[in-house]
Structures are given as structure tokens and as C-alpha cells.
Design a protein with these regions (language model features):
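A short glycine-rich, Lys/Arg-flanked "PGG" loop and its adjoining helix->strand segment in the class I
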Residues: 131-142
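Short catalytic micro-motifs in class I SAM-dependent methyltransferases
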Residues: 121-125
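Serine-hydrolase catalytic-loop signature spanning alpha/beta hydrolases and amidase-signature enzymes
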Residues: 128
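Acceptor-substrate binding/catalytic loop of class I
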Residues: 169-185
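Conserved N-terminal segment of class I S-adenosyl-L-methionine
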Residues: 1-111, 116, 120, 133, ...
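A SAM-dependent methyltransferase catalytic signature shared across enzymes that methylate proteins
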Residues: 184-202
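Conserved class I S-adenosyl-L-methionine
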Residues: 147-168
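Short, motif-level signal for alpha-helix interfacial/capping segments enriched in acidic residues
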Residues: 59-60, 160-162, 192
Length: 238
């Protein structure tokens, strides 16, 4: 079953999400690069998003949602995901945060507007990225920020090794990462959707301060606004 023609929901079982969660814990507690990524997003939004609501789309295990809620407050930050099992799990673990299940009518029926929406390691899973991004733009307020983070892989799928092995055991012979983004290819899709990059950060696995292309990069984070809402951004302090 597909959600809004964008992703195959059967891939993202609770066990799959727990594999992702284990990687996040390893990247936060041992390698530290995941913590750097989360901190960078939080710091940028603290300086640029004002006091408006924040929605974490593709929240998975809820780690970023919870991290942001500690910075902004649980009444400000919400999470959303296509996996109902993950949403139910997150609601029990983080009971002060609102979590929404993304069903086939979510983007048409969800009435709230957000000062910022985060889309962390989601776009590479989406079959039709441009229509997907256009749906998300509708949820932004007039000056809203869309944060997009995508893996920086040497070979497509090398940062989703365990997820791909898990899928092989399930008889799914499809790379969970449908494309490998560079800055230019990501910018092309964002531009087609009506978004303009305001600021970007390469998240390096070994060097927090690095912001250049490298074989040791883990992710590329871009901070965007709809084309009608352009203004000079304030770079984060860390």
C-alpha cells in the first residue's frame, strides 16, 4: 500500500523503524554525528523560526521530535509518520507530544500551519519527490522553513545497509534509498517544487565544524523557504 503515491508503507515495519532507531542511538552516543545533526537543526530553528509550531515529518522513532520538544516545548513540536505502529509507539513513549499518522488524506485534511517542518532522511525514500514537497509546502505558514536532510553516500544505500539486509530477508529486492543526492540534484528537485535554499550544512562523521564535500560526510542539511518568502538567514552558532 502506498501513502499519497509517495512511499511503500509495507517497507516501514516497526522492526525496520527500530533498526533505524538503533543507528540513531549509535550515531548520537558513540560516533556523535547524529547528535551534531540534530543540534544543528535545533540551533538554526531557534534563531530563525520564531515561536511557531514545528512538525517533524517522517519522525520514525521520534528521537528528533523529542529533541526539538525539549528545546521548544512539547506543545510546539509534533511528529508525523506513515507507520501507524511507530506513531502508536511514540505516543506511549512521548505522551506529551502530538503524533499524527500520515494516511491518504493527511495533506488534504491537516489544517494546521507550521513555522518549520523537518524532513530528515526521508526524501531519498520518496518515489515522486516534487509532488511530495509541494504537499508539504501547503503546511508551512507564510514565512515557514522547510528543513531537508539527505544522506551523503559513497554508493547508493551504503548508509542503509542494515535496512537493505532486513528487506532482503523479507524478499524485498529493492534499495530503500531510491536515489543518492548531491547538492545540485537536491537543489534541482527543491527548485521544481518552488523552494529556495537559504543555508546548507554538510554533516561530517568525524569533524563537526566541516562544511564541505567529503567522503566522510554523513548528511547534507538544507534550510529552505518557498520562493515568495526569501530573506537573509541567520547561520546557527553550532
Amino acid at each position: 500500500k502506498k501513502i499519497n503515491n509517495h512511499a511503500d508503507i509495507s517497507t516501514y515495519t516497526l522492526l525496520y523503524q527500530r533498526l533505524v532507531g538503533a543507528k540513531v542511538i549509535f550515531g548520537r552516543k558513540f560516533m556523535r554525528h547524529k547528535q551534531w545533526e540534530m543540534n544543528h537543526v535545533a540551533n538554526y530553528l531557534l534563531e530563525n523560526a520564531g515561536n511557531g509550531r514545528i512538525l517533524d515529518i517522517g519522525c520514525s522513532t521520534g528521537y528528533l521530535t523529542n529533541h526539538l520538544s525539549k528545546q521548544f516545548g512539547p506543545g510546539i513540536v509534533s511528529g508525523a509518520d506513515i507507520s501507524l505502529a511507530s506513531i502508536q509507539r511514540n505516543r506511549s513513549l512521548f505522551d506529551k507530544i502530538n503524533f499524527y499518522h500520515i494516511d491518504n488524506n493527511f495533506y488534504q485534511e491537516h489544517k494546521r500551519k507550521y513555522a518549520a517542518i523537518t524532513l530528515m532522511h526521508v526524501l531519498e525514500h520518496i518515489e515522486k519527490p516534487v509532488p511530495f514537497l509541494k504537499n508539504i509546502i501547503k503546511l508551512l505558514d507564510e514565512n515557514g522553513i522547510l528543513v531537508v536532510s539527505v544522506p551523503q553516500e559513497r554508493i547508493r544505500g551504503d548508509l542503509a545497509l542494515f535496512e537493505n539486509i532486513y528487506n532482503l530477508f523479507r524478499g524485498k529486492f529493492k534499495n530503500v534509498h531510491l536515489r543518492n543526492y548531491t547538492y545540485d540534484t537536491l537543489n534541482t528537485e527543491l527548485t521544481k517544487a518552488g523552494l529556495n535554499i537559504q543555508y546548507h550544512k554538510y554533516n561530517n562523521m568525524l569533524n563537526r565544524s566541516s562544511n564541505k564535500q567529503s567522503l566522510t560526510n554523513h548528511a547534507l542539511i538544507v534550510y529552505t523557504k518557498a520562493n515568495k518568502n526569501l530573506e537573509p538567514p541567520i547561520g546557527p552558532k553550532a
